Amino acid sequence: MAISRDQKPFKVVGVEAPALEELADSVMSMSPNALDADAIAEKARSANLDRNSAGVGGDRTSGEAVESFFDLVIDELAALRTRAEVEAIEQAAGLILECESLGGRVHVTGIGKSEHIARYVASLLSSTGTPAYFLHATECIHGSAGQVCANDIAIAISNSGTTPELLSAIETLRDSGIRIIGVSGNRESELARVADVLLDAGVDNEGGELNLVPRASILAKIYVLCALSVALEVRKGLTREQYARWHPGGALGRKARGE
């Protein structure tokens, strides 16, 4: 999306005027051909990082911190969108369909915050036509690997891709002969190395005053896994009637039935 120099293409909320003017001057000094959404996202992300770092031990208000976080997340997801490989998502969907055709099932696993994502994704996939089961990664090496059978496939989630407990679980799953879809923010990690296909969910900054607590990376992993669910939904031809049958309750169930 090209933007002319006469337009005001963006607003960085939570950045004081001098920093905003510096950002605008930097972006506007770029050649017209380079003045696109991706370049602006990169500049804005840098501004957010500078502002985020300045806030540690600084005097910005909680409202300013929230506004800065909103901007940072938008920038991180925009950057991820430029890197996201549709082919990798399609490949992951293909592996799942292949395993299902052989009678296999989908398991989703992770440690820490990734465990919560795994539980959500298992539920999301199940409600959209791909039965999936949460697998506790720690319990996996203490007997729960027994829920996994030949021709199954596991989605393993780890931001670092180096979490020891998860890697131990993957080794155990590999011994059962199943395939692995990795979801990680580290393309050079051990998880990336052992996975049959890797879905990139990397971010540069988490947001917040410490820039350590998993926030943006959580959203990034959900972002790519929701995209995977969309690919499966389309390839399976999910109908409104099917969804209503699997999700009959609540306002969403009534909406699916057209009530």
Annotate each predicted stretch with a short phrase.
Residues M1-E42:
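N-terminal acidic, proline/glycine-rich, low-complexity intrinsically disordered segments
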Residues K8, D25-V27, I40-R45, D59-L102:
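An N-terminal, well-structured beta->alpha segment
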Residues A37-A39, A47, A54:
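Ala/Thr-enriched low-complexity intrinsically disordered regions
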Residues G55-S62, F69, T82-E87, V106-H107, ...:
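Short acidic/polar alpha-helix capping motifs at helix-coil junctions
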Residues S62, S101-H107, I111, P248-E259:
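Glycine-rich phosphate/diphosphate-binding loops and the adjacent beta-loop-alpha structural elements
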Residues L97, R105-K236:
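Glycine-rich phosphate-binding loops that contact phosphosugars or nucleotide phosphates
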Residues R193, G207, V234-E259:
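Internal, active-site/partner-interface "lid" segment
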